[in-house]
Swiss-Prot record:
Protein name: Vacuolar fusion protein CCZ1 homolog
Family to which this protein belongs: Belongs to the CCZ1 family.
GO biological process terms on file: vesicle-mediated transport
GO CC annotation: lysosomal membrane; Mon1-Ccz1 complex
Gene name, Swiss-Prot/TrEMBL: ccz1
Length: 471
């Protein structure tokens, strides 16, 4: 009996990643000075120089056609190169190996590179995200040059990217990486006012706090930061910091750290950054530093992340302030009990609202929504997104169509709608209207174009009743 041999498939993977500045080694024989960081480091010196030189040549060549917009990517059969100039003269390059299928043809193994599977916009966004994450924790390249010349910059790049590149799981990158949006927690006015009042009280009591951010269930409720800074901080919190503490919580619910509190208040609060055990007199701690408003005031801040149940608060304090154990104890005793009560209130209100709206059966559609003005993002396609994986509830073929539709939207300024019928008989709809984008996947194989259009109108009326979508 003959069995069909299954094709072996290999996902896209990181081949190399490097950062260079052509001005640092302008003369012959000094080419190595241009290279500020190169991964993998084991690559032979001459090959590094050759690869950087090739990228330089490509950028220079494409500048002759468009001086202000040089190359963003280079397609070859086996890989794809992405270029990004985040600061003048500093170039970041990411080389991704194309997905691969291993097939059997006439008894021989044949390799087929599937270069069409990679979407430029997705991986260009990932490269830009690499820079923004570096800048959040290290500041700009040029500031490092001002402070400690090229050696300091090289040292910072090595320390950061050596670890960060290990968290880049390119096989799970998709449209959400293009948007880099923020998921907002739905809240009634009264509970929102309680949170606002809590933040005002804390900022008044702890007057060294410069900015505050409040999240519940990994979704944003309040932020005092600028949008672009909040966007990358949100990415760090939800894909790196919070997941680190999720597993221990799932193993067994936290018991109150100090059940006996004045006024019999329960206290579930604890630091996610900083001191692990405040009752230890010898406790050693360090808060991470972040850099915000790098375009103008260039602020260096300590990041304190404090959590009680499902509520998390980030306090940002000027890095010139000396933070002591006494300050941490004061913050803990002040914030812990109040945040515990607030987290219970939010949970109760959320459950009431869910009961009122009713638990509907599994809908026949899944969607991604993004608003460019406030970076609001909502997805029923993604079950979970962490650095190591992105669980999606739809086939990769459909995710690729969503990316293609987004690419079409980018090329035009006008509002528009695109409807596609996939090979698997699913309907995929993209709608762009007034700085908002909506992508819907419909599992209605027997529907026609008119019926699909009606379904989309119904969806907009039920899920986005307060948002105006042009017909």
């Amino acid at each position: 009996m003959a069995y069909a041999v299954q094709d072996k498939r290999f996902a896209p993977s990181l081949l190399s990643f490097f950062i260079y500045n052509p001005k640092f080694g302008p003369r012959e024989g000094e080419e190595e000075k241009k290279i500020l960081f190169y991964h993998p480091n084991e690559v032979e010196k001459n090959e590094k120089i050759r690869n950087v030189g090739l990228c330089e040549a490509i950028v220079q060549f494409t500048r002759t056609f468009n001086p202000t917009k040089p190359a963003k990517s280079l397609h070859t059969q086996k890989n794809r190169q992405f270029f990004h100039e985040p600061e003048e003269g500093f170039w970041m390059v990411m080389v991704v190996k194309n997905p691969l299928a291993e097939k059997q043809k006439e008894g021989k193994t044949v390799l087929e590179y599937q270069e069409d599977e990679l979407l430029d916009k997705v991986y260009s966004s990932v490269l830009q995200q690499c820079y923004r994450m570096y800048k959040l924790f290290n500041g700009t390249f040029s500031r490092a040059m001002e402070v400690g010349q090229v050696e300091l910059l090289k040292d910072r790049l090595e320390k950061f990217f050596h670890r960060y590149l290990q968290t880049l799981h390119l096989h799970s990158c998709d449209l959400l990486d293009v948007f880099g949006g923020i998921s907002f927690f739905p809240l009634d006015k009264m509970t929102y006012l309680k949170i606002q009042s809590f933040i005002n009280r804390i900022e008044e009591s702890l007057n060294i706090v410069k900015y505050t951010v409040f999240l519940y269930n990994d979704q944003l409720i309040w932020s005092g930061l600028e949008q672009e800074d909040m966007r990358i901080l949100y990415k760090y919190l939800t894909t790196t910091l919070f997941p680190r503490y999720t597993e221990p919580e799932l193993a067994g619910r936290d018991s109150p750290i100090r059940p006996e509190m004045p006024g019999n208040l329960q206290h579930y609060g604890r630091f996610l950054t900083g001191p692990l055990n405040l009752s230890d007199p010898e406790v050693k701690f360090r808060f991470p530093k972040i850099f915000v408003n790098t375009e103008d005031s260039y602020e260096e801040l300590y990041l304190i992340v404090y959590k009680a149940m499902s509520a998390s608060v980030c306090f940002m304090i000027d890095a010139s302030v000396q933070l002591t154990v006494d300050f941490c104890r004061k913050l803990d005793s002040l914030v812990g009990p109040q945040l515990t009560v607030l987290a219970s209130d939010i949970c109760e209100q959320f459950n009431i609202n869910r009961r009122i709206s009713g638990s509907e059966k599994e809908p026949q559609f899944k969607f991604i929504y993004f608003n460019h003005m406030n970076l609001a993002e909502k997805s029923t396609i993604h079950l979970r997104k962490t650095p190591s994986m992105s669980l999606t509830s739809v086939q990769p073929e459909l995710m690729k169509i969503l990316g293609d539709i987004n690419g079409d939207f980018t090329r035009v300024d006008e509002d528009e709608e695109i409807i596609v019928k996939a090979m698997s008989d699913y309907w995929v709809v993209g709608k762009k209207s007034d700085q908002r984008e909506l992508y819907v996947i419909l599992n209605q194989k027997n529907s026609n174009l008119i019926e699909v259009n009606e379904e989309i109108k119904k969806l907009c009326a039920t899920q986005f009743s307060n948002i105006f979508f042009l017909d």
